[in-house]
């Protein structure tokens, strides 16, 4: 999520066993995407677009504690029949601000409760998302900042920890942007993929992010598609390597406005679908959303319907966002807890995130 959302998150912070995935090269015809769900935000609060993340084990916004993240996920799965959650977290938090260091027992333990909560909800995909914008404290990974080995160290540990659960997917990095050399970034992604597979996570999905905030509209023209197409598993294949794309629907594609102006089909998802089909690959939309407004209900539903109609190349989507966001946040999809303990979805979640998938 981009800068203004970081600001909203910072404000909140201040105030507050599935069968192995099938090959991405052999997607069966389907009436809708395989995975649909939401982000469960909180552990990423305090992370800026420059790759600084300020939360510690004592200050963290833990969606499992303050926001009943377990109850939210249980509701989305059991009541709404969604089946996927993306679980954003800051790199620094996981290693207690020690670049290249071991997972911090306390911090990683808190996050592990969220991952296990996702699994226990019955979800079929639980995405670990490192929410650092291809950076550590302002410096780009593999391009003047942290070395590839230091980034690989994080992913090797996470893959080792979760290698035996095929519901866990690995989202290499949230929204790389202004990366000078996309080929070098692809080398970084390749190093991570190799480390994850060699750690024993041989079948899980790995999500590959491109440049320009991993924009679905820019993915082909900015060279991300070409560069990331060269990323392979150790056996040379690309099974379960899925391109990770984002796209918002407001006037500047920032995901900071409550009004939507486009369904992103003609300028983003149709060209991407054509390219994916030609190249026998798949993508997943792990961030998108809008306000609880008539315009967003129209356009966001149309976008999801298009993804469903092209499920041979789109694996799924996770909307932004539920978890630690309260009802004042512009793009909130956090369900509202009722007096009887049940949950009521926001308007956009009910109509589009849930409805456009459930009714496909």
Write out the residue ranges for each language-model feature.
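Active-site mouth of glycoside hydrolases
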Residues: 25-228
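Extracellular glycoside hydrolase catalytic/binding regions
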Residues: 65, 149-160, 164-169, 173-315, ...
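Extracellular low-complexity, O-glycosylation-prone Ser/Thr/Pro/Gly-rich "stalks"
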Residues: 18-39, 45-63, 327-360
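Acidic carboxylate-rich catalytic motifs and surrounding loops in phosphoryl-/glycosyl-chemistry enzymes
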Residues: 288-289, 320-324
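Fungal secretory targeting signals
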Residues: 1-22
């Amino acid at each position: 999520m981009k800068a203004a959302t970081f600001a909203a998150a910072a404000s909140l912070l201040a105030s507050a066993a599935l069968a192995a995935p099938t090959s991405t090269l052999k997607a069966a015809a389907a009436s809708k995407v395989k995975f649909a769900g939401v982000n469960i935000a909180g552990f990423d609060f305090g992370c800026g677009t420059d790759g600084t993340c300020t939360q510690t084990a004592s200050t963290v916004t833990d969606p499992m504690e303050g926001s009943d993240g377990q109850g939210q996920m249980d509701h989305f799965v059991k009541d709404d029949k969604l089946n996927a959650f993306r679980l954003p977290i800051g790199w620094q938090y996981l290693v207690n601000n020690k670049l290249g260091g071991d997972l911090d027992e306390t911090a990683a333990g808190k996050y592990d409760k969220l991952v296990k909560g996702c699994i226990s909800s019955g979800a079929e995909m639980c995405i670990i998302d490192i929410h650092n914008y291809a950076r550590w404290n302002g410096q780009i990974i593999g391009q003047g900042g942290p070395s590839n080995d230091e980034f690989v160290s994080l992913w090797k540990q996470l893959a080792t920890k979760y290698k035996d659960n095929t519901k866990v997917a690995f989202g290499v990095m949230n929204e790389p942007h202004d990366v000078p050399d996309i080929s070098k970034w692809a080398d970084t992604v390749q190093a991570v993929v190799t480390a994850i597979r060699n750690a024993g996570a041989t079948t899980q999905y790995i999500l590959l992010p491109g440049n320009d905030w991993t924009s679905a509209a820019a993915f082909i023209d900015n060279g991300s598609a070409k560069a990331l197409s060269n990323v392979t598993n150790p056996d040379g294949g690309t099974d379960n390597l899925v391109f990770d794309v984002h796209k918002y629907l407001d006037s500047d594609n920032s995901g900071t406005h409550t009004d939507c102006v486009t369904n992103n089909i003609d300028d983003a998802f149709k060209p991407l679908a054509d390219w994916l089909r030609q190249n026998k690959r798949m993508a997943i939309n792990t961030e998108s959303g809008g306000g609880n407004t008539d315009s967003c209900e129209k356009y966001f539903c149309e976008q999801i319907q298009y993804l469903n109609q092209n499920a041979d190349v789109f694996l799924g989507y996770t909307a932004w966002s539920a978890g630690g966001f309260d009802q004042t946040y512009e793009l909130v999809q956090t369900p509202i807890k009722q007096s009887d303990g049940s949950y009521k979805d926001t308007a956009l979640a009910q109509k589009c995130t849930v409805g456009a998938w459930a009714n496909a």
